[in-house]
């Protein structure tokens, strides 16, 4: 955790929350059901700071990260509570975290890489007994086989910086999402063989975006610029984001 600049990170997040929260609260629905309004020990900006800092750390699981923070760095967040209490509190930060990510995405440089990765919510044998994401998660297929859950569609630039992202049910075809995700991009978009589609190529080309993919084994050889071949070899960069 020594590599994390906590003060700078918190100031950035807190400045965002001061702008975001007033607008967010106006959109929240009210209910006649009365709830206990017990004050949380941490404010929204503190919760978001802890969640974001975890992704900058080298610790594998969030539980170990939080317990270490609780044991050795409690002075940074005096209002810290138990791990189980924080997990229940973390839910309130989901929408603000998505908004924060969207406001801090990078700009298109002319070279973009697209890919999708499965987010599995349970083992295939437990699909019918799964309740948490019932009605939301769907069966899908990836290069690793069939899964039950969601798909994270991601576009980055050549530096590994996020340009666009979207979470969909697992049964959504990757090509159906590319058009929406790439609406603000120009130049070249590099993808794997799963994005081969003449319809998608023409759609993107009309907007000034050229889709570049590798050819399948059963396809005829085609001419490709050397620079494009080299960038396709670096496409694995997106898998490390």
Labelled PLM ranges:
Residues 1-241:
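Short alpha-helical elements
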């Amino acid at each position: 955790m020594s590599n994390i600049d906590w003060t700078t990170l918190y100031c950035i997040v807190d400045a965002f929350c001061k702008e975001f929260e007033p607008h967010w609260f106006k959109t929240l629905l009210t209910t006649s059901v009365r709830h206990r309004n017990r004050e949380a020990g941490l404010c929204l900006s503190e919760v978001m700071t802890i969640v974001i800092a975890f992704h900058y750390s080298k610790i594998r699981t969030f539980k170990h990260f939080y317990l270490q923070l609780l044991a050795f760095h409690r002075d940074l967040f005096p209002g810290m509570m138990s791990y189980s209490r924080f997990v229940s509190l973390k839910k309130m930060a989901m929408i603000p975290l998505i908004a924060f990510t969207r406001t801090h995405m990078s700009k298109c440089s002319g070279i973009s890489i697209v890919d999708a990765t499965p987010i599995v919510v349970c083992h295939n044998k437990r699909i019918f007994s799964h309740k948490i994401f019932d009605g939301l998660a769907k069966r899908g297929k990836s290069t690793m086989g069939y899964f039950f859950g969601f798909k994270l569609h991601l576009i980055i630039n050549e530096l590994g910086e996020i340009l666009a992202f979207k979470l969909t049910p697992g049964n959504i075809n990757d090509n159906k999402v590319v058009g929406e995700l790439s609406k603000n991009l120009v130049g070249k978009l590099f993808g794997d063989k799963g994005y081969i589609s003449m319809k998608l190529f023409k759609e993107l080309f009309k907007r000034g975006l050229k889709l570049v993919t590798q050819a399948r084994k059963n396809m005829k050889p085609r001419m490709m610029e050397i620079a494009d071949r080299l960038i396709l070899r670096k496409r694995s960069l997106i898998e490390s984001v």
